[in-house]
Design a protein with these regions (language model features):
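Conserved N-terminal entry element of GNAT/NAT acetyltransferase domains
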Residues: 1-22, 183-208
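Active-site/acyl-donor-binding loops of N-acyltransferases
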Residues: 2-6, 75, 123-181, 236-239, ...
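A conserved beta-strand-loop-helix scaffold within acyl/acetyltransferase catalytic domains
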Residues: 15-98, 131-132, 201-281
Length: 369
């Protein structure tokens, strides 16, 4: 969740709900000013308009023709225990022009965004705010802190780049890199033994209806899982503006897709790759997908692979069992929720994120960092 300033202050001009196509120029100017990023012209339409889960709620506050603040709440389709997909919200870009911070613009925007979400029939909205704004959400705006996510790390090599990456978890973690790399290679060997001769992992340029069939098979296992249709996966990864994602499919001898993994390639000159999504029908397919992901990242020169998991979740347990190492105790980001329809089944599920199926694919950010 990109959040640029959330400081309360004096009354603010009223925000207006806008369509991205009608306000792209103003949104792009504000995006550049708030975040210092120059890719808004291609990122914002992709993010706000093109998701097969639905268009985002986008609010814009202007003084005259000048944009001073904006708020995006992205549509997500969530399935619960095999039921029909339900539209919910996930907060996205929340931005205030640097010259207009401290005026309460964010507070007004959030309140209106929640009313717009209620009007859309979304029973809940979730968010992953930065540390500066998390307390404002929960103390002033009616949000609840429901859990946290943490970044786990798999050490692929034992060199200086891996030691530098593990320093984030502390000095001892950095010193232990040779042992951690050896332990990781042992875990990868166990993964290969689990799937050897049973499935075949190959790179896939685009997801097909086989991904739809896989999702239908597994979606009933969790009380909260965002819909992973082929259309969504292609939008989220294949058509993403960064072009930094690569997918591998895991196939049974009969040609059915039993699992897949998606990795995010390291930024040029960097050594950190990411396992951003993985879905598997069983333990054999999981092993094949995870090894395909780690092998791809090592092949392109990554020293470590990272993956974010909800604390206490199935995905966190799988990462640990696969050889990923825990972060420093304080290295976490809060998950917050705003319940708009208390009687809805998802109002209960949203308060138990440890039961979710949630990977980096489910975050609002296009790329992990």
């Amino acid at each position: 969740m990109d959040t640029a300033s959330a400081s309360p202050a004096a009354a603010a001009p009223s925000p207006q709900r806008v369509a991205c196509a009608d306000a792209l120029d103003r949104q792009e100017r504000l995006y550049r000013a708030a975040f210092g990023k120059s890719d808004g012209e291609r990122v914002l339409p992709w993010r706000y308009e093109r998701s097969p889960h639905g268009a985002s709620i986008t609010l814009l506050t202007c003084e005259g023709e000048e944009p001073v603040a904006a708020y995006a709440c992205n549509a997500r389709r969530v399935c619960s225990a095999g039921g029909a997909a339900v539209p919910v919200g996930e907060t996205g870009d929340v931005m205030t022009h640097p010259e207009h911070r401290g005026r309460g613009l964010f507070l007004t925007l959030d309140r209106q965004a929640m009313e717009e979400a209620r009007g859309e029939g979304w029973p809940v909205v979730i968010g992953l705010p930065n540390s500066k704004s998390a307390d404002i959400f929960t103390t002033k705006l009616g949000w609840e802190a429901v859990g946290s996510i943490r970044p786990w790390t798999f050490v692929l090599t034992a060199g200086a780049q891996a030691r530098a990456a593990r320093r984030r978890a502390g000095r001892l973690a950095s010193i232990a890199v040779p042992w951690t790399a050896w332990r990781g290679s042992m875990r990868r060997g166990a993964l290969r033994k689990r799937f050897f001769g049973k499935i075949n992992a190959v790179a896939i340029p685009r997801f097909t209806e086989k991904a739809d069939a896989l999702f239908e098979e597994v979606r009933g296992r969790w009380p909260w899982i965002q819909e992973r249709s082929a259309a969504f996966l292609n939008w989220r990864f294949v058509e993403a503006p960064s072009k930094r994602f690569r997918a591998h499919g895991v196939y049974a001898p009969d040609g059915s897709l039993r699992g897949y993994a998606v990795v995010q390639l390291p930024e040029r000159g960097e050594s950190v790759g990411w396992v951003v999504d993985l879905l598997a029908a069983d333990e054999v397919a999981f092993a094949g997908a995870m090894e395909a992901a780690l092998g791809h990242l090592q092949k392109v020169g990554a020293a470590v692979a990272r993956a974010t998991a909800v604390e206490g979740s199935w995905w966190e347990r799988q990462l640990r069992a696969s050889g990923f190492r825990a972060p420093a105790s304080g290295d976490r980001k809060r998950i917050i929720a705003h319940v708009l329809e208390p009687g809805h089944a998802l109002a209960q599920a949203v308060r138990r994120p440890a039961d979710w199926y949630f990977t980096d694919a489910d975050r609002d950010d296009e790329v992990c960092s």
